Amino acid sequence: MFRSIRSWSAIALFALMLAACGGDKKGDEESSGETQAACTRSALGAAPDLPKGWPDLSEVTYTLQTEQGPTTVVEGYFDGSLETAHDDFKRELEAAGFTILFDEIEEDDSEVSWKGKGRSGQVALREECGSDDKIFVHVTNRPA
């Protein structure tokens, strides 16, 4: 009898573990919809709220801006490849006097973490606009 209880307990525990590993499809769909909006909207009507001296890359179009507490999030797209976007942001941030805290480029995404002018944040770049030559841009900008 105890062996049967232990077996059923093990099966129940395994089922719970599998259920806990399931992804949140709704969250993924919402994120994808927000990304597509940033990739397809028109440019912001005013300059985005980024630190003074922020590089003005001609290939970047900022389309969305939101406030999340003390953090400003600016999104849009980069006309060009992921590698070019990564290299341009890193180079131009350094040239504008920002310190690069960390940068990484992978097959489908990239990050450049920065600090300067009393602010810090990250430029996240992802191949999620539907083509290899249009890259989703997500910039976080918060007090340092």
In which residue ranges do the predicted regions lie?
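An acidic-aromatic pocket/loop used at catalytic or ligand-binding sites
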Residues: F2-I11, A15-M17, G22-A144
